[in-house]
Amino acid sequence: SGSKTAKIGDGCFGVRIDRIGSTSGMGCGGVPKPTPGGS
């Protein structure tokens, strides 16, 4: 995953899925705030 935007919601892929990655919590554990109930 890209170390550049991995903090925003890079989501294991390398795509800038900010809203999806952060909200869904599929940010490879690199999300700043893991939302409860995010699959």
Curated annotation (Swiss-Prot):
InterPro entries: Natr_peptide, Natr_peptide_CS, Natriuretic_peptide_brain. Disulfide bonds join C12-C28. SMART domains: NAT_PEP. Pfam families: ANP. Expressed by the venom gland. Its main location: secreted. GO terms for molecular function: hormone activity; toxin activity. It is found in: Secreted. Residues 1-8 form a propeptide. Keywords: Disulfide bond, Hypotensive agent, Secreted, Toxin, Vasoactive, Vasodilator. GO terms for cellular component: extracellular region. PROSITE patterns: NATRIURETIC_PEPTIDE. GO terms for biological process: regulation of blood pressure; vasodilation. Snake venom natriuretic peptide that targets both NPR1 and NPR2. Exhibits hypotensive and vasodepressor activities. Belongs to the natriuretic peptide family. This is Natriuretic peptide CnNP-a. The lineage of its organism: Eukaryota, Metazoa, Chordata, Craniata, Vertebrata.
